[in-house]
Structure formats: structure tokens, C-alpha cells
Amino acid sequence: MKPQILSKMGQRTTEPPISWLMHAALSRPKLISLAAGFTDSASLPVAEARAALNQVLRSPKTGQPALQYGITAGDTTLRQLTARHLQKLDLQAASRLGVMKCWSDGAMNPTPHHSNTPILHPETYSSKRLLITSGSQQLLYLTAEALCNEGDIVLVEDPTYFVFLGILQSRGLRARAVRLERDGLDLAHLERVLQSLRRNGALRRVKLFYLVSYFQNPTGVTTGFQKKCGLLKLLKKFERAAGHPIYLFEDAAYRELCFQKDNQAQSSGSTPSPRPSGERAGARGLGLENHWSPHPAPLLGWRGEGEVKSALAVPGAVDRVIYAGTFSKPFATGVRVGYGILPEPLFTAVKHIKGNHDFGTSSLLQHLVARVLASGIYGRHVARLQKRYAHKARVMKLAIKKHFPPAVEWWEPEGGLYFWVRLPRNVPTGVKSKVFSTALKNDVLYVPGEICYADDPARRKPNHEMRISFGNASEADIREGIKRLGKVLRKLI
């Protein structure tokens, strides 16, 4: 028998789906990709980045630090600017909506707080526990490496970000899925999952809950602040049986990609959520049946920059929340600068592991991001991008309404880059399906929904959904791509 030279991890690690999706998009000139979540190339801030870099490199005093090694945790100035930026996002949400006091008398019960003074503690956003990473993606991997042993369990949304599922598989970790509702996580289902794991003696292997909290990839759902409170309360409730902390990892990669529209509806704190559309819109849940409210409340306007506070703003939760953000999607994906706020002992462990990986994120790119943050370039660019994506989403929505058959359901996002689409249950959309192969023959590509679901033995993996992106496609390509895909769907449904 030929000896196996690869480690167990090397054997488990397969090519990520994102790799062949990107390869297909880049290698076929006539193909219209509605798959990979590329950002809008036409909106990339070339002139702004050039001006900022010119300022960084204008003299030896400013340029030499940017071209030298830095510290593993990240440039001190950028960490301070990032901490203030994150605190500002939560303060804006708190000021608009009123703070929800979630840890009243240690009970973590969400109750409205109507004081004019937001209850947000500066130490929560301390730059001393903020780590700069090479994109927020790196923090996903580093956290799994620092926290989890082979065979441990990570709780995820159902569906979830498929690249993170690949990280779990590579490291030999198990995923257990928790259903989504139109306003975020299904807390009742989470409690049942935790109870089942406790009965089976597996709760001690649960280390983490992974939540894509804003305009979720792939569904577009936003989990509201009250649900974040309830989530943390449930995790804390089961910690005694687990015998260790159970952390919440809040992935906020899409937080600032909220849509800016004219004449925004005024609300009093409702959580934005995607609008179900189609002939039977709202009749079934995201992925699993009967979990979506059949009578969704009217969708209220999203007014920008994070109406929903992060889990960091939950009083008393600072030692249980890992928060990941990024400057890549809101500014320029090629910059690959992200950040995380972590509690101890995780912060130190992750920092040390990162040091073994790369000694620290690119100094030049960190100085670039610090310059655009401090100068206001970043904020102005994000505001333009929010309007741009709102327009492109509207173009895709109108094309879907025109070309998709009535049997297809879809959810209209209020931020992010994606539409989530569901076909009748007897029409699979996977890589080996007739829909996928016919779409490729017609030079249009989507992400099969099945790759966004964890391999959870507690339920059958849905295979009749798809994710389509308006991020990088031109308006003409969005219209033509949806037309091609609609032709395929009308033929096969």
C-alpha cells in the first residue's frame, strides 16, 4: 500500500467551490457570471487610492514605515481608527433606534431603553483587543485554529457562507445547522438543537456559533439586535452543561453595504429583512420548509450605516463575542484588510497564530486604509457604493420579475450583493443538475444553493435553490444574464 504523505488536514482539504466559480467567470469571455461575489469593478476607487498612496509615500518619514515590517496585531493608528469607526457604527444605530438593554439584572432580556444616552461602553471597542487581518476571511481560519480541536462542533445558520463550511471541513470540525427566519436566526430551533446536543453528550464539543449578521451571505437576511441578545442568552444558558464558554462569532462583512435610497421609509426600530416574492412568496422558509412567516410584516426602509447594533453592544457580552469586519468589500476587495475584536484568551492566541502565518498584514495596505479612513475618502466612497448597489439590485429585481416563471420564489435584499432564489422542490439546482448544466450551456453561472448548507445529519440538505449576485456584473449583463437564466428556468420547470 502506497504511504500517505499528506496530513489528515491535507487529505480533507478540497478545492473550495469559490475557486472554480471564479475560474469559470474569468476563463470564459462570453459567460455572464451571477455567481462569485465580486464587488463592482467600475466603482473601485482608483483615483482615491492613488491620492492616498501618494500621501503615504510623500516623504521618507511617512513612507518608510509603510514599506517596513509592522507588528503582528496591526498598525497602531489603523487599529485606533478602526475601533472608533466600529464604535461610531453602533452609536449611530443606538442613537436612531434607542438602545436595547439586554442584560438587565444579568438576565439578558431585551427591553427597550429610551434614554438619550446610548449604553455603549468604550472599553468594548478598545483597540488593545483589535487585530488587523488579511481580510476578514483570515480571522475565520485563525479563530477555528485557535479555538477548535478535530471533532469539535460549530453551530451555523442554515444556509450559511459556504467558504466557512470549507474551513470547518478542512480542520475536521462538524457543523450543526440552525434555521433562519425572515428576521434572522430561529431562536426556538437553536434551543432545540442545543438541548439535543446536551442529551447526546455532544454539547461539550460545541465551541462556537457562526453568524453572518448583516445582509447574510447567501440569503440577505439581517439578524436583529434583540435576536442577538436572545442568541447570547441561550449560549450562556448552556455553558454550564458544556463546561466551557461558547462564543458568538459575528461576521459583519456586509454591514456597510446597506442600500441608500431616496425617500426612505421611516421606522421605529424594525429590523430590515429580505422581501419574499413570487407566486407563493412567504409561504415557506429559507431552505427548510414551513419556517418562513406566511404573512411577513411590511418591509421598512434601511437608512444606512447599520441600523442594527453589533453583538458587541450587548451589555456584558464582551467576553463572549468575536466580531469580524472588513474594509475590502466596502472599499476595495484587492486591498485585503480586515479586522477583528476578540476577548482574551482568544485575542492573544489568534495574534500568535497569525504571527506564525504572516508576521502581520501588509504594512503598505494598512497605511492606505488608515489614510482613507482619516481623510474621509472611505466614508464618501461607501456612500456612493450604497447607492450604486441599491440601483443594481433594483435592475436585477426588475429583470427577475420580467423573466423568471411564477413558480420561482426569490427574496429582495436591502443590502449586500445577493438575491436568494428558490425553485420548486422537485427541480434541483446543484452542480450535477439539468438546470446548472443548461445554464452553463447558455453562458450564465449561478451558485448552487446546496453548497451553502452544512452536512447536518439532522435534516436533508435542500438542493433546489440558488444564489445570484449583482455585484460586479454591468447593468446590461444583469439584464441579459437574468434573461438567459429565466429562459432556462421556464424550459425546465
Q: Where would I find each of the regions flagged by the language model?
A:
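N-terminal small-domain helix-loop-helix segment of the aminotransferase-like
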Residues: Q11-S95, H121-S134, A374-S375, R380, ...
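Conserved core of the PLP fold type I
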Residues: R58-G98, L120-P245, F249, R255-A265, ...
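Short, conserved charged micro-motifs
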Residues: V427-K434, A476-E480
